[in-house]
């Protein structure tokens, strides 16, 4: 998506501002008695408190998007041995960064970008669009589940530098079945392992909040030893969340409108959209957003 250009006043305000989340939800990742669905339902419930109803739209509508985010939520993902905290914008449910147990914030972006997080965050060194995280691969290639989330949390919690840790992790994982793929990925991109872990969390948490279909699919296979993946169609829908939200506003004014790009996604009307999407992005502001953790790739 298009990146924003912040005014000097915006930059100063963000630099001096300490983020205070509206709420923090804790998810004990390895607790088999705590369903993924319960975690997502709890976070959605708190997000909806900050949403509005819009005439003609079935789903709750998120707060208006701001150049400098005003509303945040945190989710703390805890394993038996470690934890990380995800910082998510309330106005668009984009993951902006994560905090390690040592208190270090890692933020999507690179030198020269504008920090959105406080507490002296460090740049991850790459952006947060799906194109940045998985290249041209489809989201159906992302394997998720309780075990995948556990590994992601444990690995990301140990992050200390931009590249050296990823190289160490790849060496440690060379005995795994996918060792050849990991080695090839590391040779091409030293941060490939970090990107792989982050995209799993983005889909399971952020897209799980946005999409009914995603949360149901992930929940159904969350405890599977083999993990769970989205369908090709679900993956394409996820990457068009912004466009689906725009369509929801169009259908609010013109209920019988035929929207070709929605038909290509298997969404014929607002009833079908409501079955698929749980939370709609507010379209009443023309504000463009910064590239953050799970931007739609519509405008890439």
Swiss-Prot record:
It is an enzyme of class 3 (hydrolase). It is found in: Cytoplasm. Accumulates to high levels in seeds. Keywords: Cytoplasm, Hydrolase, Plant defense, Protein synthesis inhibitor, Toxin. Gene3D superfamilies: Ricin (A subunit), domain 1, Ricin (A Subunit), domain 2. The active site is at 207. One of its GO terms (molecular function) is toxin activity. SUPFAM superfamilies: Ribosome inactivating proteins (RIP). It catalyses: Endohydrolysis of the N-glycosidic bond at one specific adenosine on the 28S rRNA. The keyword Hydrolase applies. Possesses features of some constitutive defense agent. The coordinate Opaque-2-controlled synthesis of this protein and the major seed storage proteins (zeins) may provide the germinating seedling with both nutritional benefits and protection against pathogen invasion of the surrounding endosperm. Belongs to the ribosome-inactivating protein family. Type 1 RIP subfamily. This is Ribosome-inactivating protein 3.
